[in-house]
From Swiss-Prot:
Pfam families: Methyltr_RsmB-F, Methyltr_RsmF_N. It catalyses: cytidine(49) in tRNA precursor + S-adenosyl-L-methionine = 5-methylcytidine(49) in tRNA precursor + S-adenosyl-L-homocysteine + H(+). SUPFAM superfamilies: S-adenosyl-L-methionine-dependent methyltransferases. Forms a tripartite complex with archease and tRNA. Binds only the oligomeric forms of the archease. PANTHER family: 28S RRNA (CYTOSINE(4447)-C(5))-METHYLTRANSFERASE-RELATED, NOP2 YEAST -RELATED NOL1/NOP2/FMU SUN DOMAIN-CONTAINING. S-adenosyl-L-methionine binds at residues 118-124, 142, 169, 186. The active site is at residue 239. Belongs to the class I-like SAM-binding methyltransferase superfamily. RsmB/NOP family. It comes from Pyrococcus abyssi (strain GE5 / Orsay). It comes from the Archaea. Coiled coil: none annotated. Keywords: Cytoplasm, Methyltransferase, RNA-binding, S-adenosyl-L-methionine, Transferase, tRNA processing, tRNA-binding. This is tRNA (cytosine(49)-C(5))-methyltransferase.
Amino acid sequence: MDYKEEFKKINKKLVERYSKLDDSEEFWAYLYKPLRPSIRINTLKGNLKEIKALLEEKFELEPIPWTKGEGFYIKSYDVNYGQLIEYSLGLIIPQEASSMIPPVVLDPKPSEVILDMAAAPGSKTTQMAQYMENEGCIIANDAKRDRANILIANLTRAGVLIAKVTVKDGAYFARYENTFDRVLLDAPCSSVGMIRKNFKFARTWSIGKVYYHSRLQKRLILAAYKSLKPGGVLVYSTCTVDPLENEEVVDFLLQKTDAKLEKVKLPLKTSEPVIEWEGRKYSDEVRKTIRIHPQDNDTEAFYIAKIRKPR
């Protein structure tokens, strides 16, 4: 099958744009391919080894190498989480493998005060609470009330006790200058990575959405950085491939503030960050960020930047 041609039938402009970014056969083939099911074992609710043993009675598990031992692929495409007692009890959290990377990079510690600026549906929030051992505080924010309700349900099922859910425009948190030990901005985006979950993201993609999200992301990342304590860490992430929503947003922050990028070392394959796009030239510092295309690790596309505020 010619996967690029298949995508042209769905959205020709999407293909025209991202062929300039990665025109390999593998890029389009993996973007077409369904995602492998993946879960996190929730140690807030039980012992990792015991829960893993329960799951292995039903499925073959494969460790996800960039997690802290709690992430697994389920080697079966026929998984109905709603029918699993382990899901109902909050012992497992369904979560795409690459979306587990931002909390690993943020590395929150017990007793810290964390801002999750765009938290819903909450899988990353529960992951952070797990790393914090339910000690400290997470402000779990979302701009939309209906999404915040889903967030609350997921936090409750996971046994998260340290999250305070707010419904605010993320830029609101700029008023809390130098407040948070760490901030996660998993930003709203054009969701090209989500095409592997549902082709509607290919059908509904438009360049207008890219421009809209890029403007929003720049507003949010400035607020996120302002709210961060000196010495603190901000992780910026998206599940898309567009440089206007990734490298451009990080480059914008570097130009506007004293932010410093830190190189991330994890056991995963990555694609080269984009230094030049549509006549724009970005700082060489963005080479320290992580760009993941679908074929790199057979996951969603993702982008992650680790940012430090100097003391």
